[in-house]
Every structure is written in structure tokens, then in C-alpha cells.
Amino acid sequence: MLFRSVFGDGTVVIKRTVGHTPGHQALFLKLPKSGNILLSGDLAHYTDNWEHMRVPSFNFNKEQSIKSMEDTAKFLKDNNAVLWIQHDLEQNAGIKHVPAYYE
């Protein structure tokens, strides 16, 4: 999985997660107090999709999507990170919203 550190220190990293679209990316945040978080973008639309590696029919490339999901699962484990799935309403209800924040 290719990546680019935005500030050069690994605290904000753009990760290549192609499949949904040819140039799809996810954003990794290394937060000193809140821990490591990966914002999934459209890598998975719901937790159930993620847990069962289900890919929507409208994705650009199913095989690339599954490979990106597998690579991301390893990345999450290696970096002790949690995955935030933007479209998952149940997960979204359990995270802080403005004006609250993560540090």
C-alpha cells in the first residue's frame, strides 16, 4: 500500500486504497491522546461490508477493492488503528461531533 506523509512526520498520512475509484485514498491520523485512526473514505460503506469484504457493484474494480481492504486490515493491525467508515450511521453515532474533538 503506497502512502505519503503530509507533514513528513507520519502524523497525517494519505494511503492509496484503489478500487472504489482508480485514485481512491484513505487518511491515517496519528493522534497523541486519542490514538490512531484511519478515515476510510469509500473503502467500505458500512461495517458489515468491511467485516465481510463486500464490494458494491458500482466500484471501479472489485479485485483492487478487495486487495485494498486486505492491505488496510493489515495496516490497521500493524498500527493499532481503528477504522472510521464514513457512511456507517451506527458507527458515526458513536463518535464525537463538533464542537467536540479528538486530540
Explain the meaning of each model-derived region.
Residues 1-2:
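Short, small-residue-biased leader/transition segments that mark boundaries at the very start
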Residues 7-11, 15-20:
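Extended serine/threonine-enriched, polar tracts that run as long, contiguous segments within proteins
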Residues 22-103:
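Cap/insert and terminal regions of metallo-dependent hydrolase folds
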